[in-house]
């Protein structure tokens, strides 16, 4: 579920923290992907026919997650991303009640799905079939095997995948976290990417403006979130707990706006509980906000030294066996995917241009003078002003001394010219003086300015991806 209403609140209150980017902007970047969320989306999105059933092999086992993961990963690599897939470990104990609620919702959805099938209501079948989806342990293991054979790094988190993704950005081992769960921000991810799966699909899944706009993603920058909301990280965590998270109940009657105002006034949940009207706002009897806070601050994750990230060569023959023999994929289609995979690996090895250059700036004389004047005005005490004045006096004296030397040289040269005595004295003197004046006053330097022409490079990548209509994660979908 993530944090209730967080993305909308950030968009309204700290709009500079959210921006749309093209997938090309992530070229050369390492992105940590919430694998469980991705598999869930693939199973929902890839359907066989109008009955919205999953793709299956001859044994009747679902293969939608394999097809989606393989296709999507190659597509991301073709766009220059370097994906790392992070899988969930054991769920935290605090999440037990939330998981029970999800189980109840899933059971209710299954009942509604059965009814919809009896009535032949295709729209309701599609809606309820999505709510009944859950990623099984076997599907997770198959996904890990597929990625390993493709040479893609796989990380198994001891607990929450989005928490591990967030810490990979803290370790500077990844640029961003890709997930639909906004609680990755509460875990401290530097950058959150949303809609990554929805926007790396086949050409059929692009909107009508996609040819001009490209694949559009949503990027949320945590630093800008805190700056825009004017909150510390600790205050932001408490704010998110009050909005509603997976780890504890929240105070009834408090939404995101009220929670924000209370945090701004009282700074933390402890002070809020002491000061609010508890007749108006009902505090849960067993309000485990302290435990929830600690789960966000100190989640169970692998330490940096425990994380191993290796992009390996694909195991082509084993990959063919896994897809064709074990899961009955079409051989021609598999060959096509492998060809694209090998080609895409070359794209991911390209370095970003900003890794080749560093910015070097040289201050102009005008800027130096302005800064000196400001420094003089800001100098505190007569001592600092006197010191600046002394420095200025020394500079002026040095300039004066230089001018005297130049004048002496000029005088000596003039005397030399005057002492010449030949029949063309006057003419020679005038010529020498003209040359002298030209050298002294009319010296010019010609420089050419260069223009760098930015050219847009367009690359059309054809693919045979399965059409994937990825839904955005909403509160009514059981994630």
Curated annotation (Swiss-Prot):
Cofactor: Mg(2+)
Keyword Kinase set for record: no
Co-factor binding details: Binds 2 magnesium ions per subunit. They probably participate in the reaction catalyzed by the enzyme. May bind an additional third magnesium ion after substrate binding.
I-domain: annotated segments: 124-266
E.C. code: 3.1.-.-
Residue positions binding Mg(2+) 1: 34, 88, 160, 162
Segments of skewed composition (Basic and acidic residues): 403-428
Region Interaction with PCNA: start-end pairs: 349-357
A Gene Ontology molecular function term of the record: magnesium ion binding
Binding site for Mg(2+) 2: 181, 183, 246
A Pfam family assignment: XPG_N
Top-rank EC class of the record's enzyme: hydrolase
InterPro entries, A to Z: 5-3_exonuclease, 5-3_exonuclease_C_sf, Flap_endonuc, HhH2, PIN-like_dom_sf, XPG-I_dom, XPG/Rad2, XPG_CS
Domain of life: Eukaryota
Chain's role: Structure-specific nuclease with 5'-flap endonuclease and 5'-3' exonuclease activities involved in DNA replication and repair. During DNA replication, cleaves the 5'-overhanging flap structure that is generated by displacement synthesis when DNA polymerase encounters the 5'-end of a downstream Okazaki fragment. It enters the flap from the 5'-end and then tracks to cleave the flap base, leaving a nick for ligation. Also involved in the long patch base excision repair (LP-BER) pathway, by cleaving within the apurinic/apyrimidinic (AP) site-terminated flap.
Subunit (UniProt): Interacts with PCNA. Three molecules of FEN1 bind to one PCNA trimer with each molecule binding to one PCNA monomer. PCNA stimulates the nuclease activity without altering cleavage specificity.
Identification of the protein by name: Flap endonuclease 1
Organism from which the protein derives: Plasmodium chabaudi chabaudi
Lineage: Eukaryota, Sar, Alveolata, Apicomplexa, Aconoidasida
Gene responsible for this protein: FEN1
């Amino acid at each position: 579920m993530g944090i209730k209403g967080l993305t909308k609140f950030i968009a309204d209150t700290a709009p500079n923290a959210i921006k749309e980017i093209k997938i090309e902007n992530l070229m050369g970047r390492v992105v940590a992907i919430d694998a469980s969320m991705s598999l869930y989306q693939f199973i929902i999105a890839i359907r066989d026919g109008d009955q919205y059933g999953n793709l299956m092999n001859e044994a009747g086992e679902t293969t939608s997650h394999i097809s989606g993961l393989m296709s999507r990963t190659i597509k991301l690599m073709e766009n220059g991303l370097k994906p790392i897939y992070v899988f969930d470990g054991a769920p935290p104990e605090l999440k037990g009640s939330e998981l029970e609620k999800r189980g109840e919702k899933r059971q209710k959805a299954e009942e509604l799905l059965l009814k919809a099938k009896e009535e032949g209501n295709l729209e309701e079948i599609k809606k309820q079939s999505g709510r009944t989806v859950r990623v099984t342990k076997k599907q997770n293991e198959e996904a890990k095997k597929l990625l390993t054979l493709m040479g893609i790094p796989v990380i198994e988190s001891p607990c929450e995948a989005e928490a591990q993704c967030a810490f990979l950005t803290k370790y500077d081992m990844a640029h961003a976290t890709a997930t639909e769960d906004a609680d990755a921000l509460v875990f401290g991810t530097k950058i959150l990417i949303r809609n990554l799966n929805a926007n790396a699909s086949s050409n059929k899944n692009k909107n009508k403006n996609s040819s001009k706009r490209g694949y559009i993603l949503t990027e949320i920058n945590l630093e800008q979130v805190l700056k825009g909301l004017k909150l510390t990280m600790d205050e932001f965590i408490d704010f998110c707990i009050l909005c509603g998270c997976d780890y504890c109940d929240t105070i009834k009657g408090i939404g995101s706006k009220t929670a924000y105002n209370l945090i701004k006034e009282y700074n933390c949940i402890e002070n809020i509980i002491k000061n609010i009207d508890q007749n108006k706002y009902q505090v849960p009897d067993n309000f485990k906000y302290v435990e929830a806070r600690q789960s966000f601050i100190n989640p169970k994750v692998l330490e940096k030294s425990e994380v191993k990230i290796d992009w390996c060569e694909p195991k082509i023959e084993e990959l063919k066996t896994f897809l064709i023999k074990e899961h009955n994929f079409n051989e021609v289609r598999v060959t096509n995917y492998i060809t694209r995979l090998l080609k895409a690996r070359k794209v991911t090895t390209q370095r970003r241009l900003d890794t080749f250059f560093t910015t070097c700036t040289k201050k102009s004389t005008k800027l130096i003078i302005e800064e000196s004047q400001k420094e003089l005005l800001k100098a505190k005490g007569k001592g600092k002003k006197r010191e600046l004045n002394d420095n200025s006096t020394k500079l002026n004296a040095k300039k004066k001394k230089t001018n005297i030397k130049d004048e002496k040289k000029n005088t000596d040269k003039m005397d030399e010219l005057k002492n010449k005595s030949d029949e063309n004295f006057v003419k020679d003197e005038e010529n020498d003086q003209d040359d002298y004046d030209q050298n002294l006053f009319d010296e010019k330097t010609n420089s050419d300015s260069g223009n760098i022409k930015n050219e847009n490079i367009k690359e059309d990548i054809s693919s045979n991806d399965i059409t994937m209509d990825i839904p955005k994660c909403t509160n009514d979908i059981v994630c």
